Amino acid sequence: MSYLDNYIERIKNKGNRALADAINKTVSDIVPQYISNFSFRDHVVSLLVGDVQSGKTSHMFGLMCAAADEGFVNFVLLTTDNILLQQQTYKRAEKDLSDFCICDENDYLKFVQNNMKKPAVIVLKKNGRILKQWKNNLSSTNFVAGNPLFIVDDEADAASLNTKVNKNTQSTINKNLEEIKKTTTSSVYMEVTGTPQSILLQTVKSGWKPYFIYYFRPGKGYLGGNFFFPPEVPPYIVLTDNEEATDILNDEEFPENGLKVALVTHLLTSAHIMLSGGEVCNFLIHPSMKTDQHKGFAEKIGEYLNEILYSYEEDVTKSFFKSIYDKLKETKSKMVDFNEAYEYIIDQMKNDRISILVLNSFSSYEENTQYDKGLNILVGGNSLGRGVTFPQLQTIYYCRVAKSPQADTMWQHARMFGYDRDPDLMRVFMPPKLFKLFSDINRTNNIIIKQIENANNGNDIKIFYPTGLKPTRKNVLDKKSVGVYSGGVNYFPFYPVNKDINALDEILSAFENDIYSVNLKLITRILDLLDSETEDWNAKVFKGFINSMLAENPSAQGKLIIRRNRDIAKGTGTLLSPNDRKLGDEYKEEVVLTIYKVTGNKGWNGKQLWIPNIKLPGESVYYSGEGMPQDGSSKSNYQYDLKVDLDKVSESPASYCCNNKKNI
């Protein structure tokens, strides 16, 4: 049997046939087109996108097995710079890839002695010292240079990208990863993430722009963004006061609050799960990135537990539990008996079986991993993100709001996503402003996914968010190559080009000089026939934004304003008449394309032509990265040259970058 067959068989033997089928689909969609015909002389970058905690690792392992069947023998599996996650990944690889040689960070001798007898997987943290060490290790062997590396970068948007792209130099991790690729004559570098925003906005020149993108859908039973963060608040979200997190720690006599309700919710949920035969139930508290606040919240939870233990016989305490039990029954009708649950909780407390674990950089590896059995309350910050999984996580108290929120970072902290949860007993406690942010992120995530599925390899993905919410950290984006456009701003070309004025005349002949509601697809067809002599206005970019809206809603409408016989000078600093500007501004939530046909006087050499002015929906910021070349050239022409000219990393011209509030 092949490596892939063995892997799939092991999954089926565990009773997970649906997962096996999903992995087979991913493999059959990717391997024949991109792995089987690998040239063994190029360096190819690809992107595998899956929802947060949706089973990306299983699909990664499936693709690695399929690659081994195609002749790849040297694999590097990268994790974020987190001991817990690296060890979690290493142990899982040992278990799931039992016919591979699995190497830890200190297993160089094991790797060399294996000498390609089995496919080898080296599991490494993205740590500068570790990566440099393994770059030297790989270079020192006599079998790596002539055989391609298959590098799988889990959470590739974290640490791997060049954080100094705007300083004409290269960050340490990014440089080390590039040098690891250089240890061999060819490689496949598979970026894997649930938050691809920063990767989608990379340039081709950077070497991290994926040639192809694949999205795999989560399996049955997955609870993700659409479950927790639809446009309207679902019953699984419990809204807390926006300032509660600060007030709780500052006021020792703080009355009944969301944290206390969340704790009792966890206790009752745990009682139901454990009395129903379960082995674990977890409660996650994410208050801040500050470790002193982690300690403060852990102590506050301890105080609440002591209060319950001292007063459990009092009617007021039992009534408080009963009120929360009744709220849980609104979504979980078949709960265990209340009195039985209450007795179980008190027994667990009396016997000190409820664990409070603080997970942060000051905790040891052993302290950070004791949450797979029993009733656990986990408190932490950054250690709770990026790939660390918590079994049977049913209750979350999330109150961290960044001053300048980034969509990808926030989404990675959404540890409530996953499979092994009881959906009817899920509860997430958060303030309204956090729910709104998560809901906005979820909407854009769905639009990104639809673009990936609809586009040719997902090469031209457009991203937009409400003002104040950024897609990612700015230090990994080449500011000269990422277009930033503001909703509500009018954009038009100084020097417009009509590719085919007769075709434009024909399309627009059905419209008088007036305003019309039209399908956005018509606006994209008009944009196909327009351009600019210079790089001040890019029709493809605006078309890309509109296509992202159509991906969400194929019948989406926009406004088309037609004006003819306009006598406007070439290169004018303004285009719209005051009345048309006012008219367009009335439609704040729609795309507005105003198109003027000029007489040809005043610098146009007597030639009539159409001039477009486009306004994107307001209160949002739109981001455009650099698409892969689409000129019909073969794939091999667009592999990445690893001899990067670092003096020119940030000098590629922008298609158009404007983030102001005025016309140009």
Model-derived features with residue positions:
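C-terminal accessory/interaction regions of large nucleic acid-associated machines
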Residues: 401-425, 540-664
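Conserved Walker A/P-loop ATP-binding site and its immediately adjacent core
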Residues: 59, 72-96, 289
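Conserved RecA-like ASCE ATPase "motif II neighborhood" in helicase/translocase motors
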Residues: 105-152, 160-180, 380-381
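C-terminal catalytic or substrate-handling cores of phosphate/nucleotide-
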Residues: 256-282, 287-292, 447-552, 556
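Conserved RecA-like P-loop NTPase helicase motor core
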Residues: 359-436
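Conserved C-terminal RecA-like helicase domain
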Residues: 90, 99-101, 148-151, 276-377, ...
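Conserved P-loop NTPase catalytic core
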Residues: 117-119, 147-153, 165-273, 282-284, ...
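Motif I (Walker A/P-loop) of helicase-class P-loop NTPases
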Residues: 56-65
